[in-house]
Regions:
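Conserved helicase RecA-like core
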Residues: 1-355
Length: 355
């Protein structure tokens, strides 16, 4: 099965070349697929199945017209699958426009309330960012997602946390696909300890082990709150959900209590003492190699170079992620500089790559 990925932020030329050879499955972002339709470099007239995944996210990001254009380029006789975590009016409109006599399947969000410990803290609106640092210094989770309601707040909070010594990155809409990939790779391989994100940008993010979720702002949508905290406490792990609430947000907390059929538990920020040591550093560092699948680079090639010429052990090498043109490898923090120097002056699979 030949699969092609068409995303914005990647060179158009190689995508056009790949499309000329055809594909069984195309996975892409609405904007880039619409660009290819406009250029005449993609033909959707024989599409049998159209999947609109994370539909609410795409609509929130302003892609409704692009989606409509893609649907119009597909044959009328087709199977269309629309997936959405929420079902607001815009998605009802999309369903009516893009689907014919659809069958609706609804899966209720379910989380083991005993597996996720929820703690609520009252803060002033201006004190949120300082409170996030206070929570991180006290609980010291290895990996945390901090949810903000706006991208501006995401950027501000991530910058403040970095200034205080935390390894923090911001994830929000309007990032290029390459930027998003780099951020997600670093968070997934534990090179970044705190991911500050909007709900829209964090959709589809799958991190198996997450130490904590911090709700920097209380969500007005109870289902969104449940989706947020459900990212921690997966499998058999215990989860920790920490929510900051300004006085004017208590009405939203009341909705959460109604949904959960029970009161939330409040705690006092003033009682939190910093744990020993300074801000928790991410245990890993990510190296970026300017080569990927198009260069026939494989994870085993990089692992061989690191454990061979560089002299690292397998335990000092973390996750290796190979993309079309880039490769990312997580290394134990204390070995990263040595590995960077060795690889910069050495070779991988008999070839030199920029780092």
């Amino acid at each position: 099965v030949k699969i092609l990925t068409l995303c914005g932020g990647s060179p158009m030329g190689p995508q056009i070349g790949s499309l000329e050879h055809g594909a069984h499955i195309i996975v892409g972002t609405p904007g880039r697929i619409r660009d290819h339709i406009g250029r005449g470099t993609i033909n959707l007239s024989t599409v049998q199945t159209l999947v609109l995944d994370e539909a609410d996210r795409m609509v929130d990001m302003g892609f409704y017209e692009e989606i409509s254009g893609i649907v119009s380029a597909c044959p009328k006789r087709r199977q269309t699958l629309l997936f959405s975590a929420t079902y607001p009016d815009d998605i009802r409109k999309a369903s009516a426009e893009f689907l014919r006599q659809p069958v609706e399947v609804k899966v209720e969000a379910q989380h083991d309330s005993g597996q996720i410990e929820q703690r609520f803290y009252e803060v002033s609106y201006d004190g949120r960012n300082a409170a996030v640092a206070q929570l991180l210094n006290h609980y010291k989770p290895v990996s945390t997602i901090a949810f903000c309601n706006t991208k501006i707040h995401c950027r501000e909070l991530a910058a403040e946390l970095r200034d205080q010594g935390f390894s923090a990155l911001a994830l929000y809409g309007e990032l290029e696909q390459r930027e998003r990939d780099e951020i997600l790779v670093q968070f997934a391989n534990q090179s970044c300890s705190v991911l500050v994100a909007t709900d829209v940008a964090a959709r589809g993010l799958d991190i198996q082990t997450l130490g904590a979720v911090i709700n920097v702002d209380v969500s007005k949508d109870t289902e969104v709150h449940i989706h947020r905290i459900g990212r921690t406490g997966r499998g058999h792990d215990k989860g920790l959900a920490l929510s900051l609430c300004a006085p004017n947000e208590k009405k939203w907390v009341k909705l959460i209590e109604d949904y959960q059929k029970g009161p939330v538990t409040w705690f006092d920020l003033a009682t939190l003492e910093p744990a020993e040591g300074g801000p928790l550093q991410a245990p890993m560092v990510t190296l970026c190699i300017m080569g990927g699948k198009k260069d026939k680079l494989r994870p085993g090639d990089l692992l061989g170079a690191l454990t061979g010429d560089v002299g690292l052990t397998k335990d000092q090498v973390g996750k290796i992620s190979v993309f079309e043109f880039m490769t990312y490898v997580a290394l134990e923090r204390r070995m990263a500089k040595h590995a960077f120097s060795s690889l910069s002056n050495g070779n991988i699979k008999g070839r030199s790559f920029k780092m």
